[in-house]
Amino acid sequence: MSAKIQKTDAEWKALLTEKGAEPVAFNVTRHAATERPFTGKYEDNYAEGTYRCICCDAELFDSSTKFDAGCGWPSFSQEVKEGAIEEHVDKAHGMTRTETVCANCGAHLGHVFPDGPTPTGLRYCMNSASLDFKPR
């Protein structure tokens, strides 16, 4: 499935700049870069609210599913609703992982691993730079 929202790199850069996104946000969301562990602004955020895509504002995660995985990136046990996130096989860096992207705009979010808490057993390991937090 292809993203519903499509823009040029210049348009994404302008949008992220206008939103005041972190400088690394463009490379993370549009070129699948990864922010350094323990550096993201949401890694230690446990306020109640919703995490949205920094590029298109689509709801991705509810704070009630966030947990401390000790990995250095914000981790969630499930997406806010089925279909909010798409998964793709990622064979970069000599390993096979499952990449997660925003289903609405294709922004790279991070990866999902099968080592999370019950009931899903999943750990959505996200880049803070790809998220925007909206408190309740």
Swiss-Prot record:
The active site is at 125 (nucleophile). Its EC number is 1.8.4.12. Residues 9-136 form the MsrB domain. It is an enzyme of class 1 (oxidoreductase). It catalyses: L-methionyl-[protein] + [thioredoxin]-disulfide + H2O = L-methionyl-(R)-S-oxide-[protein] + [thioredoxin]-dithiol. The keyword Oxidoreductase applies. SUPFAM superfamilies: Mss4-like. Binds 1 zinc ion per subunit. The zinc ion is important for the structural integrity of the protein. PROSITE patterns: MSRB. Its cofactor is Zn(2+). It comes from the Bacteria. Zn(2+) binds at residues 53, 56, 102, 105. Keywords: Metal-binding, Oxidoreductase, Zinc. GO terms for biological process: protein repair; response to oxidative stress. The keyword Cell cycle does not apply. One of its GO terms (molecular function) is zinc ion binding. One of its GO terms (cellular component) is cytoplasm. NCBIfam families: peptide-methionine (R)-S-oxide reductase MsrB (TIGR00357). Belongs to the MsrB Met sulfoxide reductase family. PANTHER family: METHIONINE SULFOXIDE REDUCTASE, METHIONINE-R-SULFOXIDE REDUCTASE B1. This is Peptide methionine sulfoxide reductase MsrB.
